[in-house]
């Protein structure tokens, strides 16, 4: 439809041109490859031109050149093949339209297109100018038009246009980034001869939120896209204004530094004004940050901030500031009288939160139940006087108000008048009167109606009187007491509110009791009590002693001695003296206090009986009491954690802050009570109560069973058989982690698993039992109280039995029992006659029939049996679930012996034998008893009793009864009594004869009837038994011989070996019980033999040999152990040729038998003695004040060395037998400068001696920082130099960061307002007459808000474009940094939040944040904002990312393996482009390599030597440009490692093994000894040993062995590996190398000595030749020599032929003698003249 409209437009345009020959078409048209385009075209001609045969329309391509036909309306065949099917003429020529549609565009279609139309001969027209068509590969960037200025609320149109129009394949324009709820889009296509275009319009109503918004318009055609972005700059008033509170989440305390920051989310332009308002009143401060340096009461209120700019302003939401503090207001104000009501209000500043909780304390004691804001004291008394304060608390903390004093005025109470004489310094009497009164009372002391003293000053001013007074106190001291001073004294107290008085009868001759050494002593200490009196000592003087008012002693001694005071001696003592003339008054009481250590605490842990049971409301009680004076400090521990303590935690008046909410702690002297509400599983277990005081400690434990584990049976505890039952273990616990449940039935383990429920389906009678459950968690375990499960079922068939009871008379007992639940009702019948029933027992109490009923049992006793009692008896059982019955026939028989309780007896039982006849007992009947056929003469009654039967009384008993006057006897059948007993007195004896036969003997014996079965076990293996035949036991092993007898078992082991060792157990069992006896057999089959002795001196030869007797020698594995550590190898012996202290250990050999545990021999301790060594002398100084100096001397020596410590040649201390071995400690309290100097320590033992010394210097000078070492900027700071030893005049020299600052007599530096420049280390130097002393540096830290923020950026384009944005700031404490881009947070100092483009990597350092962003377009100039904030304030800065300049790009990368091809390209900002006549210079490590005209530097095979820093310099027509350097890393596998061995030359005790390798990247190094990993460059990869120290550095691994043990010697292999390969090397490390080194040194010494000898001989020969030469020169006429040349050798013939060299000087002689070339030259003959 749109296309038809376009054609109509073209047609209308054609009508306008009818008046002339014209062609209208655009000058240019653009298209995209693969798409299409339209050239809109209209033409016209004069109206007078006739059209006889129509109009021919023709389009040409390159009309002025090739003139190719594109379209022909009459003859399509002439169209060029290139345009066939792709060019289409739109419209009809008769309508004057000539538009051309060109499809499937190709770049070759670019060029000029011309239109020609032909009407007839002579009427033709061609458009010569034509239309230029441009076809590109990708679309051009669309054009966006927008207003120059944008502001909030404005409605604006954004037009996005493109020149591409294609009707067949639409060209799409699309807006992105807008808010669809506030915007609409519309589009418009233009297709006119004047030109073609496509426009998309975005209509938006702007909001402040659109500021910074990125809008993009994207054109898409032919599957290709191109877009353009615009960044909106919308002007608006500040938005999102809010206040950031520095104390968010915590309380603002008085004096805190509070910071309020006015934060603005968005503002354009920037905020220009800030106005702070508090409680509606404007503040003077107009900065973004409002600081309250010391928060106070007046600072509380509601704060708002108003931020404005040129557009407008906005106000933040109000923020309430509450200063967390309190003060107490007392009402009424002024004097408070008794019985008044006093109100104390706990006031807080404004904006106090509603969740505040209040507590009140009086005199630092918590007032229970007072938790409201006001405390009301009704009808106050003097007891209410005191200091009160309130405590406010919320979830963030607690704060206490200043205390206020409440004073209750009241009249004077009865005065306290006391008197005592003082006899130590003459006769002095002291009278003391004190009273409780408010206001203070006036005190008057009178005697005999006369005023002796008063607080007002009136009274008798006798020179013997001395008066002292204080508020509410008066003291009178009377010198030279006399009889007139005795009598009644009165003390009167008066005030404006009332009067009071008291009297005292004073005796001037009263005694005085003194306690020595003190009135308070420690238990066990001796105490002396002395009685002093004014009486003259006479022979008849006697002293009476009283304790707590009771007379305890009377005698002539004036002293009472308690040799060892105990707690029973504590109390109130007084004494009295008397003689024949007079009696003294009683002494004032004196209290003796005996201090004692805590006794054993009485500790109970239980549930409160009132709340015990399952469910909520339970309460656990822990109560610990102790007897201690002084009171002990108590603390309760549970699983090693302190849960309560009598000490105050936190210093508050309330209960300890460390207790959790369910726990309440009550404290009293020597008592600690803990209440646990709703105790959980974690609260159960053993608690320990510890009592401690300065005199000792004691403890007691108790177990708390909180019943946190409860077993519940549903649907009920009582169920009918066949119903389902669920057993659930309900556990009250705090943790919710995994748990394991164990189920117990009748005390035995029944089931286990993770489920807390067990189901019985269906339940049966066998399930009836007592059940319990147990939970096991990480926090602990808990066992429930057993619960009984009752199962109901109908009666089974009853069991009916008849027994002859011989208890009383001829009696039969019928017993009917049944199994049923609930219990059954039983009834017993003879025939149809009911005899007895369990429900109705109506039989006569003394009748012949007696019935007894119990649960499911009915017993009928029939006495005086007769034949009529014979017959059929049956029993019926009935309950609610059913019934059953059974019957039997009973026949009465003759006389018998009745035995009670049974003929089968256990030893010690009581037994009664009765002789019974069926007709009953007649009077006068005689009885005789027989045992084993022998009459018992001692028994003639009808009964025979044994109170406790013994084995000797067992046998066959019968009785004979004969009635009086009858000749016949009734003889009973014999009854046999058998006495049995359980096994007892079992013994197992083991004996070992280690002689030649190595015989082991085991003998087991026991007493038992019936005889016990004896079993002898070796471990769990049965080796002998009384049930086996002798032949069978003997055949089991030829070395074993077994012998058996009743209750006896004997085992002989011949040739005992290792396998026979172990624990043997003898079990003795019969029907009455069992007993065990165990014994260990030590066959002594394995032991360690030490030669020459187990105690040797260091350096001796020691041999340890194992001896073993075994039958499986080939199957055994032998091991050696040293201090429980297994040694490598399985040698028969260990040879220590040169034993060292490291060999001192416990040795034992072990044998491992297949299938059995390891067996070890008895350990043998090898003790190595050595002389003192490693002598160390150290000192420690107290860190603060220098009050204590400790000098410590330690040594390594065996036997322990005698240590002596001396100072300046003077012996100070020496070790004794009671000292810690090899340690001597000297403590110097309050050290003085004279204590400084050289200290020497000497260690002596029988094997040697060692000495060392130490210079002691005292650090008495210190720097103190007040108020703290860390203060905010602007706060006052004082730096003080403290030197206790300073003596005036003193000079103080100050240094700041090691630089001189000032000097003078002032010991302090004061900074009224600290700045950053004041931060640093301060040191002071003190100079006085004693010398110069200097302190250690003390660091001062200054806190300040962020400032000097810098945002910088650069490009890192080594492989792909990467932008680096870096933000730095100056801040203390370090700032929290946020980096954002166009309003979106990219990264913070906590990590990456989100990136607008690419993937980012964040690097964080102190006050520095760096963001690396990949794939950022180099034209990106968007703004980055960095916000820095700490607790003191914030600052922000912004910057733009500058376009990228010349840079180096590496392909395939900058980290390449060795041998790889590599290209380094010098990229220009505009890309490869046209480089013209540019040249490129390349540099490596700053040195120029070469210059080329191409921007690429090629490496065919890169080598490791070519690694380094590269950069390029481009010489362009516009000038030179240099890139940033890039680092090229060449990667290669490790080379063969280099291993170096160092061994201590003196003895090989210490050694170093060093392994190094060359590789890139760094290699991972490992060091192996055989298969054992010794060291690795990876941390904690190898197990650390105490004597091995491993240090790793890049491509290096070093092992230091302080003690080179035999197990550490051998072939070491060093392996190096990285991602490209690995390599290894091996070397020997041990004393063998040291031995070879010694041999090599000896060889060198020998060769050197030999060479020296040869040189000496050669020198002597040269000297001898020289002397001979000179001698010949002196003998003129005998020899003459003519020199031919310098290089010739002269040969002389004499009687003795000699070869000598003659030259100008002696040097030529040496050359001839030592240079072999001279010996090889051709000699020439010369003439000699004699």
From Swiss-Prot:
Example GO BP: negative regulation of phagocytosis
Q: Which residues are glycosylated?
A: 339, 499, 726, 730, 1103, 1138
Write one Gene Ontology MF term.
Answer: carbohydrate binding
Question: How is this protein situated with respect to the membrane?
Answer: Single-pass membrane protein
- Domain Ig-like V-type intervals: 23-135
In the UniProt record, the signal sequence range is 1-19
Q: Which InterPro entries match?
A: CD80_C2-set (IPR013162), Ig-like_dom (IPR007110), Ig-like_dom_sf (IPR036179), Ig-like_fold (IPR013783), Ig_I-set (IPR013098), Ig_sub (IPR003599), Ig_sub2 (IPR003598), Ig_V-set (IPR013106)
TM ranges are: 1643-1663
Q: Which residues lie on this side of the membrane: Extracellular?
A: 20-1642
Which PROSITE patterns does the UniProt entry name for this protein? IG_LIKE (PS50835)
Where mainly located? membrane
Occurrences of domain Ig-like C2-type (ranges): 139-227, 238-316, 317-405, 415-505, 511-593, 601-705, 708-790, 798-893, 897-976, 983-1082, 1083-1165, 1172-1257, 1259-1335, 1346-1442, 1443-1529, 1537-1630
Which residue spans belong to the Cytoplasmic compartment?
Answer: 1664-1730
Q: Which CDD domains match?
A: Ig
Belongs to which family? Belongs to the immunoglobulin superfamily. SIGLEC (sialic acid binding Ig-like lectin) family.
Cite the domain annotation text: The sialic acid-binding domain is essential for efficient PRRSV virus attachment and internalization to alveolar macrophages.
Tell me the subunit arrangement. Answer: Interacts with TYROBP. Interacts with CLEC10A. (Microbial infection) Interacts with porcine reproductive respiratory syndrome virus glycoprotein 5.
Q: Quote the protein name from its UniProt record.
A: Sialoadhesin
Organism field? Sus scrofa
């Amino acid at each position: 439809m749109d296309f038809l409209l376009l054609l109509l437009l073209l047609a209308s345009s054609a009508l306008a041109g009818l008046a002339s020959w014209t062609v209208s078409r655009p000058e240019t048209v653009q298209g995209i490859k693969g798409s299409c385009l339209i050239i809109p075209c209209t033409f016209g001609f004069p109206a007078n031109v006739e059209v006889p045969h129509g109009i021919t329309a023709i389009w040409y391509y390159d009309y002025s050149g090739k003139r190719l036909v594109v379209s022909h309306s009459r003859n399509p065949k002439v169209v060029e093949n290139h345009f066939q099917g792709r060019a289409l003429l739109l419209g009809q020529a008769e309508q004057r339209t000539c538009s051309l549609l060109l499809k499937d565009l190709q770049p070759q279609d670019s060029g000029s297109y011309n239109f020609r139309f032909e009407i007839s001969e002579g009427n033709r027209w061609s458009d010569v100018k034509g239309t230029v068509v441009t076809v590109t590969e990708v679309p051009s960037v669309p054009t966006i038009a927008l207003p120059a200025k944008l502001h909030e609320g404005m409605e604006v149109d954004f037009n996005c246009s493109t020149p591409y129009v294609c009707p067949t394949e639409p060209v799409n324009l699309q807006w992105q980034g807008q808010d669809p709820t506030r915007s609409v889009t519309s589009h418009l296509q233009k297709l006119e001869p004047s030109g073609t275009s496509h426009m998309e319009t975005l209509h938006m109503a702007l909001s402040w939120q659109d500021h910074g918004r990125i809008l993009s318009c994207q054109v898409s055609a032919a599957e290709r896209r191109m877009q353009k972005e615009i960044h909106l700059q919308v002007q608006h008033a500040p938005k999102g204004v809010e206040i950031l509170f520095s104390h968010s989440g915590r309380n603002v305390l008085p004096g805190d530094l509070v910071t309020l920051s006015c934060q603005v989310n968005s503002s354009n332009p920037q905020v220009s004004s800030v106005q702070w308002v508090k409680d509606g009143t404007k503040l003077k401060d107009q900065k973004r940050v409002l600081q309250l340096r010391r928060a106070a009461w007046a600072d509380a209120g509601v704060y708002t901030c108003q931020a404005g700019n040129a557009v407008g302003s906005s106000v933040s939401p109000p923020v309430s500031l509450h200063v967390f503090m309190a003060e107490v207001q007392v009402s009424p104000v002024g004097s408070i009288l008794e019985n008044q009501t006093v109100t104390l209000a706990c006031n807080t500043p404004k904006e106090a939160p509603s969740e505040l909780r209040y507590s009140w304390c009086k005199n630092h004691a918590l007032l229970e139940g007072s938790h409201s804001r006001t405390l009301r004291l009704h009808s106050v008394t003097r007891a209410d006087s005191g200091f009160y304060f309130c405590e406010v608390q919320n979830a963030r903390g607690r704060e206490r108000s200043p205390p206020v004093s409440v004073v209750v005025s009241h009249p004077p109470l009865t005065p306290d008048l006391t008197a005592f004489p003082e006899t130590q310094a003459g006769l002095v009497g002291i009278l003391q009167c004190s009273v409780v009164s408010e206001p203070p009372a006036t005190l008057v002391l009178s005697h005999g109606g006369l005023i002796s003293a008063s607080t007002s000053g009136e009274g008798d001013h006798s020179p013997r009187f001395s008066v002292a007074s204080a508020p509410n106190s008066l003291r009178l001291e009377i010198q030279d007491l006399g009889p007139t001073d005795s009598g009644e004294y009165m003390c009167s107290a008066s005030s404006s509110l009332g009067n009071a008085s008291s009297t005292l009868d004073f005796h001037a001759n009263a005694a005085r009791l003194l306690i020595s050494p003190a009135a308070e002593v420690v238990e066990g200490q001796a105490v002396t009590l002395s009685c002093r009196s004014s009486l003259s000592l006479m022979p008849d003087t006697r002293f009476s002693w009283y304790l707590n008012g009771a007379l305890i002693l009377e005698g002539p001694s004036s002293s009472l001695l308690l040799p060892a005071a105990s707690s029973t001696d504590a109390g109130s003592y007084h004494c009295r003296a008397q003689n024949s003339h007079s009696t003294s008054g009683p002494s004032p009481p004196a209290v003796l206090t005996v201090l004692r250590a805590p006794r054993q605490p009485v500790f109970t842990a239980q549930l409160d009986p009132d709340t015990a049971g399952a469910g909520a409301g339970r309460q656990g009680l822990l109560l610990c009491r102790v007897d201690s004076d002084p009171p002990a400090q108590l603390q309760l521990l549970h699983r090693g954690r302190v849960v309560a303590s009598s000490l105050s935690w936190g210093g508050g008046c309330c209960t300890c802050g460390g207790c959790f909410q369910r726990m309440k702690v009550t404290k009293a002297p020597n008592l600690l009570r803990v209440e646990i509400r709703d105790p959980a599983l974690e609260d159960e277990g053993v608690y320990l109560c510890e009592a401690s005081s300065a005199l000792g400690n004691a403890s007691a434990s108790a177990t708390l069973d909180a019943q946190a584990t409860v077993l519940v049976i549903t649907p009920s505890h009582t169920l009918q058989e066949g119903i389902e039952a669920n057993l659930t273990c309900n556990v009250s616990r705090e943790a919710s982690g995994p748990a394991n449940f164990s189920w117990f039935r009748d005390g035995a383990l029944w089931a286990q698993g993770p489920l807390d429920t067990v189901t019985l389906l269906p339940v049966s009678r066998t399930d009836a039992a007592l059940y319990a459950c147990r939970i096991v968690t990480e926090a602990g375990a808990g066992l429930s109280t057993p619960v009984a499960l009752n199962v109901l079922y109908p009666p089974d068939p009853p069991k009916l039995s008849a027994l002859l009871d011989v208890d009383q008379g001829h009696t039969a007992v019928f017993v009917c029992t049944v199994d049923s639940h609930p219990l059954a009702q039983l009834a017993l019948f003879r025939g149809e006659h009911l005899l007895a029933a369990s429900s109705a027992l109506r039989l006569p109490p003394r009748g012949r029939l007696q019935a007894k009923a119990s649960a499911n049992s009915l017993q009928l006793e029939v006495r005086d049996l007769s034949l009529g009692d014979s017959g059929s008896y049956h029993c019926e059982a009935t309950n609610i679930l059913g019934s059953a019955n059974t019957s039997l026939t009973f026949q009465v028989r003759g006389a018998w012996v009745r035995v009670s309780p049974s003929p089968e007896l256990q030893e010690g039982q009581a037994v009664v034998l009765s002789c019974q006849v069926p007709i009953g007992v007649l009077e006068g009947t005689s009885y005789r008893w027989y045992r084993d056929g022998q009459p018992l003469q001692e028994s003639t009654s009808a009964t025979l009793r044994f109170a406790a039967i013994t084995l000797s009384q067992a046998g066959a008993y019968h009785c004979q009864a004969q009635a009086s006057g009858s000749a016949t006897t009734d003889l009973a059948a014999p009854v046999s009594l058998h006495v049995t007993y359980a096994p007892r007195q079992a013994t197992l004896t083991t004996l070992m004869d280690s002689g030649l036969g190595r015989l082991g003997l085991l003998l087991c014996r026991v007493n038992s009837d019936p005889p016990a079965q004896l079993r002898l076990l070796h471990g769990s293996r049965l080796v002998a038994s009384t049930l086996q035949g002798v032949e069978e036991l003997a055949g089991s092993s030829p070395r074993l011989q077994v012998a058996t007898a009743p209750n006896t078992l004997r085992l002989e082991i011949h040739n005992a070996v290792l396998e026979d060792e172990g624990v043997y157990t003898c079990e003795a069992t019969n029907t009455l019980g069992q007993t065990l006896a165990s014994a260990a057999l030590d066959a002594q089959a394995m032991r360690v033999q030490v030669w020459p002795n187990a105690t040797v001196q260091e350096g001796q030869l020691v041999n340890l040999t194992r001896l073993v007797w075994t039958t499986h020698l080939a199957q055994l594995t032998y091991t050696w152990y040293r201090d429980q550590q297994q040694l490598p190898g399985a040698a028969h012996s260990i040879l220590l040729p040169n034993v060292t202290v490291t060999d001192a250990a416990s040795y034992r050999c072990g044998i491992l038998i297949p299938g059995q545990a390891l067996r070890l021999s008895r350990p043998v301790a090898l003790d190595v003695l050595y002389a003192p060594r490693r002598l160390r002398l150290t000192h420690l100084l107290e860190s603060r004040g220098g009050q204590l100096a400790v000098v410590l001397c330690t040594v390594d020596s065996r036997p322990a060395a005698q240590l002596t410590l001396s100072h300046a040649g003077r012996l100070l201390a020496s070790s004794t037998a009671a000292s810690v071995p090899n340690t001597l400690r000297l403590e110097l309290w309050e050290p003085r400068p004279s204590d400084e100097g050289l200290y020497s320590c000497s260690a002596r033992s029988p094997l040697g001696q060692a000495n060392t010394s130490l210079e002691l210097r005292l650090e008495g000078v210190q720097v103190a920082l007040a108020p703290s070492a860390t203060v905010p900027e602007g706060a006052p700071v004082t730096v003080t130099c403290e030197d206790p030893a300073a003596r005036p005049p003193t000079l103080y020299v100050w240094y700041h960061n090691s630089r001189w600052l000032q000097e003078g007599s002032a010991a302090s530096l004061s900074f009224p307002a600290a700045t950053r420049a004041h931060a640093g280390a301060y040191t002071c130097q003190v100079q006085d007459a004693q010398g110069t002393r200097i302190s250690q540096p003390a660091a001062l830290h200054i806190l300040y808000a962020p400032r000097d923020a810098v945002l910088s950026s650069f490009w890192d384009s080594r492989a792909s474009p990467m932008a680096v944005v870096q933000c730095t700031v100056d801040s203390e404490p370090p700032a929290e940094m946020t980096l954002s881009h166009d309003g979106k947070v990219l990264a913070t100092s906590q990590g990456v939040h989100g990136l607008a483009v690419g993937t980012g990597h964040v690097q964080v350092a102190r006050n520095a944040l760096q963001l690396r962003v990949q794939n950022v377009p180099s034209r990106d100039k968007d703004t980055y904002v960095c916000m820095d904030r700490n607790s003191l304030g914030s600052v922000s800065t912004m910057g733009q990312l500058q376009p990228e300049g010349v840079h180096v790009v590496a392909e395939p990368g900058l980290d390449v393996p060795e041998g790889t091809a590599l290209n380094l390209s010098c990229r220009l900002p505009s890309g490869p482009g046209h480089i013209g006549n540019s040249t490129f210079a390349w540099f490596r490590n700053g040195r120029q390599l070469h210059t080329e005209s191409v921007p690429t530097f090629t490496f065919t095979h890169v080598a490791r030597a070519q690694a380094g820093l590269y950069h390029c310099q481009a010489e362009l027509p516009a000038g030179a440009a240099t890139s940033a350097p890039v680092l090229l890393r060449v990667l290669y596998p490790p080379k063969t490692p280099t291993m170096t061995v160092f061994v201590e030359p003196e003895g090989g005790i210490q050694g170093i093994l060093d392994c190094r390798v060359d590789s890139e990247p760094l290699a991972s190094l490992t060091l192996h000894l055989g298969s054992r990993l010794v060291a690795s460059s990876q941390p904690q990869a190898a197990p650390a040993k105490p004597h091995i120290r491993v240090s790793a550095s890049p491509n290096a691994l070093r092992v230091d062995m302080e003690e080179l043990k035999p197990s550490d010697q051998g072939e070491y292999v060093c392996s190096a590996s990285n991602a490209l390969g690995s390599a290894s090397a091996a070397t020997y490390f041990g004393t063998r190398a040291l031995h070879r080194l010694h041999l090599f040194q000896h060889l060198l010494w020998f060769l050197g000595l030999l060479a020296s000898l040869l040189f000496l001989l050669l020198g002597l020969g040269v000297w001898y030749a020289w002397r001979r030469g000179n001698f010949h020169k002196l003998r003129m006429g005998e020899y003459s020599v003519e020199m031919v040349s310098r290089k010739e050798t002269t040969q002389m013939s004499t009687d003795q032929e000699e070869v000598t060299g003659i030259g100008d000087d002696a040097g030529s002689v040496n050359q001839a003698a030592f240079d072999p070339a001279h010996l090889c030259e051709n000699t020439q003959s010369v003439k000699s003249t004699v």
